Amino acid sequence: GIITLVDAINAENTYNNHKEAIKQTALADKIILSKTDLSESSNINSIKNRIKKINPKANIIESNKKNLPLTELIGLNDYDPLNNSWDSRKWLAIEKYNETTNKNTHHNHNHEHEHHDINRHGDNIESFSLVTNQQISMTTLNFFIELLSSQMGSKLLRLKGILNIKGKDGPAIIHGVQHIFHPVEWLKEWPDEDKSTRMVFITRDVKKSIIEDFFKIIGKN
C-alpha cells in the first residue's frame, strides 16, 4: 500500500503549485494529514474535502506532534483477491466515488451508464465509476486493458474493476496503476447478487468522456 504525507499548513499551496503532490495523493491508499494541531479546523476540513475529491477511497488520518496513530499504518495492502476472506466490495468502494456528488436518478436498464464525476475543482484529476450490466468477453477485456495502457499511460492514475466475463461463474478482478496492470485474478463466486461490471477510475489530464468512449467498447461486445 501507498502512504502519502500531507502537511495541513501548506497543503493548499502545495496542491496549487505542484502537480506531483496531486498525483501522489491520487495514488495513495492512506493519507497522513500532519500538523493538524497547528491549523484551524476550517482549514483542515477544506483540505480533507479536497483530498476526497482527488482520491475518494483513501483513508485520511489526522496526526500532530503528540499523536501519530501507528496502528493505522498496519494492513495497507487491501488488494488480495486470492485470500478467501478478501472483500472485493470494500476494495472497490464504488460508493465513495459517488457519495460526494449530487444525487442523479438511477435507471434500471441494460446498457452502460455513468456513475458520477466527483472532481470539478481544477486539479485536473477526475474520479468516477462506470457500470454495465452486459457480460464481457475475454477478448474485449484484454483489448480494453491494452487500449487504456497504451493510450492513457501515466495519466491513468488508478483503475479498479469487478467484471462479469462470459462463460465464467465468478468475476474477474482488474487493478492497474498508470501503465502497469496486475494480472487478471478470478473469484470463485460473486460476493452478492449484483453481477454487474463495475470499474472505478482516477485520471489526470484526461477527460472523462474519453474513458467513457473506451468503456462503450465493452457494451458493444
Language-model features: locations:
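Conserved Switch II/interswitch segment of TRAFAC-class P-loop GTPases
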Residues: 1-16, 36-42
